[in-house]
Amino acid sequence: MSDTGSARSGDDASDLGAGDLANRLLAASELHGDFLLSSGLRSSVYFDKFRFLTEPELLRATAHAVAGVVPDGVTHLAAPEGAATLLVAAVALETGLPLAVVRKEPKAYGTMSRVEGQAPAGAEVALIEDVSTTGHQVLKAAKALEAEGCRIGIIVLAIDRGGAAHLRDAGYRVKSVVEVQPAD
C-alpha cells in the first residue's frame, strides 16, 4: 500500500491466505485524490469497491475469505442495500446459506419491507459489508434486522477503514478481511 496509510489482514482472515488477498484488494481498489465519502468525510484515499466486486476471481477470493470467518450457528446472511449485495450473494454461494438485503428505506410498493429475502425472526445472521469507514450504514442494517427478530451473530467487513471500532462499541462482534488505517 502507499504511504498514505497502512493495511493488514483481519484476524481470522489471515488464516485463509488473506495477506495476499489484502494486497490484491488494495491494489485493485485503492485510489488517490480528493474524495467525499458516503459518511460525509473527505479523504485523499478512496477504496472503490466496484473494482474488486466486479472482478470474478477477486470477488470469489473475497467471498471465500468472508465465508471463512462466518461462525458455526449462523443460519442466514444479509447485506445493506447496494454494492455489498454482490458480495453477500457470492458468500451465499460459498456457504449455502440463504440471504437477505436490508433496504435503506422500505419501498412504497410490493412487500413494502425493509428486509427483503430470507431473514426470518429468530435467524442468526452474518451481516456483510464491502467497505466501512464509520459503520453507520451497517449499524442501521443491523438495527433493522434486529427489529425483525433476527440476531446478529457477526458483522464481516471486506475492507475496514475504521467502521469496525464503532460497530464493536455498539456491542457487535466484528471481523475484517482487510483493515486499513488511512493517514488522513
Predicted regions and their residues:
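Active-site-facing substrate-recognition patch
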Residues: 2-72
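PRPP-dependent phosphoribosyltransferase catalytic core
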Residues: 2-24, 143-184
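Conserved hydrophobic/aromatic pocket- or pore-lining residues that grip, position, or stack substrates
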Residues: 40, 77, 99
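Short, well-ordered alpha-helices that flank and scaffold nucleotide-derived cofactor binding pockets
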Residues: 64, 68, 89, 93, ...
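Short helix-loop-beta connector
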Residues: 71-75, 120-122
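Conserved dinucleotide-binding and phosphotransfer motif residues
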Residues: 73, 94-95, 148, 170
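Short glycine-rich phosphate-binding loop at a beta-alpha junction
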Residues: 73-81, 156-157
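Short, glycine/charge-rich flexible loops or terminal/linker lids adjacent to PRPP-binding catalytic cores
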Residues: 85-129, 133-139
